Amino acid sequence: FGNMFDLAGSAPYKKIACLKEKYGPILWLKIGSSMNTMVIQTANSASELFRNHDVSFSDRPIVDVNLAHNYYKGSMALAPYGNYWRFSRRICTVEMFVHKRINETTNIRQESVDKMLRLDEEKASSSGGGGEGIEVTRYMFLASFNMVGNMIFSKDLVTDPESKQGSEFFNAMIGIMEWAGVPNISDIFPCLKMFDVQGLRKKMERDMGKGKEITKKFIEERIEERKKGEKNRSIKDLLDVLIDFEGSGKDEPDKLSEDEITVIILEMFLAGTETTSSSVEWALTELLRHPQAMAKVKLEILQVIGPNKKFEECDIDSLPYMQAVLKEQLRLHPPLPLLIPRKAIQDTKFMGYDIPKGTQVLVNAWAIGRDPEYWDNPFEFKPERFLESKVDVKGQNYELIPFGAGRRMCVGLPLGHRMMHFTFGSLLHEFDWELPHNVSPKSINMEESMGITARKKQPLKVIPKKA
């Protein structure tokens, strides 16, 4: 049907969603010369996929930019379903994402958020409280970056003024996230790969190379520290764990190579930074567009915490309306609207259709979250819908799957969930937020720009005033 380039642009998931009325809940696309693609667009078809065919569609397609420096070979997110994927997922879960480990690193997140709040205040003061506002997302991203950096390396990577490596690493990660999210004609027409028409492979080679180079320097520095007996930590960080790893059987490597450690570390940054900052930016945007919801969540935080106490992670469970705001934001603005693509590992019969091995599978979480069959007034921002609902984002309710479901859902969800709520709550507790003088709630630009996540195309500018 039509022209495949009609689906290009910054929000292909919206255009694909429009086809559901005509073609039904499952869409079959032949993209380019060789890419068979199945798109899932309803909660029922997603339930069938994740409940009954999860293993059959558990591989990942490898796109051209992920070939840079052989990144895909050590990646947990892109690994074929099998022993390496199970091993890498297990080690990251145990060392970063179980509740015990998350609770042990509470102070790291508190310090990173405290620094973010100070930077927000200093930036607002240096602009003279001017009417243009500040791009608060920059500081949220920095906070997320340093939270992850401290859990891996036990140090700030960017806010440390002496860390040139940290700044270079930060810039390399920004580049990798951008190039990974740009549609690449080389993936549609493999015969064009050798020409690198858009220059994406060259850019990814540059930034991935820099990211791996700096990570390897961090690893070498740590090995030297350990040899000299310097900086012994009471709690091991992820880098220590990866260096010390010893396999326990035939399904695990005896030791992790430097390159394997490097890719695991890069992946933790890619997965753990932009998702948090982008989600909090969208949530703050929606509250500024809906002043009554803003007043309601601010009042809840004030009543639970009070004006003179810091917002802490232990407060999150006592703030149901704030949690509802973030769920509603994730329903309307899932970080990865089409999730991470899957691939059929074998010929499969799915809901009456014969799906060939190698077919790419996209799950349109954006369309599912706005489906009127499951949601009343689906295009309205209405956090109250979650106050009496048990629907959650943890992969069991298929009408709300911003982080995926099944075996390959986001492994970092427990930590990401904590980071997102803590960052958001701290910003609301510390400041009152206003729009620049020339911007009204209804005039806020709501367009998305695709990178690794669907972030705001026009970054949110706001004026923070001490609460």
Curated annotation (Swiss-Prot):
Gene: CYP76A1
Binding site for heme: 410
Keyword Iron attached: yes
EC number: 1.14.-.-
Signal peptide: none
Domain of life: Eukaryota
Keywords: Heme, Iron, Metal-binding, Monooxygenase, Oxidoreductase
Any GO molecular function: monooxygenase activity
Keyword Cell inner membrane: no
Protein name as catalogued: Cytochrome P450 76A1
Family the UniProt entry places it in: Belongs to the cytochrome P450 family.
Enzyme class: oxidoreductase
Organism: Solanum melongena
Obligatory cofactor(s): heme
InterPro entries hit by this protein: Cyt_P450, Cyt_P450_CS, Cyt_P450_E_grp-I, Cyt_P450_sf
